[in-house]
Amino acid sequence: MTSKRTVSDSKRAFFAAYPRPVNSIYRRVIDELLVEVHLLITNQDFRHDPLFATGLLTAYQALMEGYTPVEQRDAILRALCTALELSYEQLHTDAAQWRAIAAELPAQEVLEVMAGKREAGDGRLKAMGDTLAGIANAERFKYSRLFSLGLANILEQAGRAAAMSEKDRLERLQQICTYLKLDYNRVKRDLDFFHSVLERIKRSKEVVDELSQTERRKREERAVSQPG
């Protein structure tokens, strides 16, 4: 994205790409995500990598889980990508490749490469290791909440294969943060905050659904009570 584009430009581009109304509580969700990503990718230190891609898709899928109609979720994501000048296809390809590495290759090897404790041979794991080494050795790296979500998602994929406990997972996360020169406490706070946001959205949707059901019952009762 060119740095000359503003947040307002991105918002206008989104509404041009997706002119349909967005349902209730999700309007704010999409607006905040668009602003967050815009500010991130226009930062001069930002570099696209598979963990950003994984984090963005993880965030979007989790935040929009309850959105209806379901078939519009993908259309909204495509509009966001258009507005932010991101490649929808590249995001999915990058995320799918790293999720597959974490799920399909030996979990211990993946976890050691992620923590900088093993040099991978050729193939997919080496590509992951090279990317992480580049981040660890970068003079200027733009950390983001989306990066932390991507990191946590890949760690979760590998953790399932290794049958890790929550305690083990957090210890692994701390090791990876040390290798990548990230503040573990900040990463943990960002992950906890994201989960709290998901809980608030879930509760808000439950309230909206309950109000809708109550209103529908009232309409049905009025219809029954009215003389034919």
From Swiss-Prot:
Record bears the keyword Coiled coil: yes
Keywords: Coiled coil
GO biological process: photosystem II assembly
One Pfam family, short name: ThylakoidFormat
Domain of life: Bacteria
Record has Signal as a keyword: no
Entry's Gene Ontology cellular component terms: plasma membrane-derived thylakoid photosystem II
Residue ranges of coiled coil: 201-223
Entry similarity comment: Belongs to the THF1 family.
NCBIfam families: PS_II_psb29
PANTHER family attached to this UniProt entry: PROTEIN THYLAKOID FORMATION 1, CHLOROPLASTIC
This protein's name: Protein Thf1
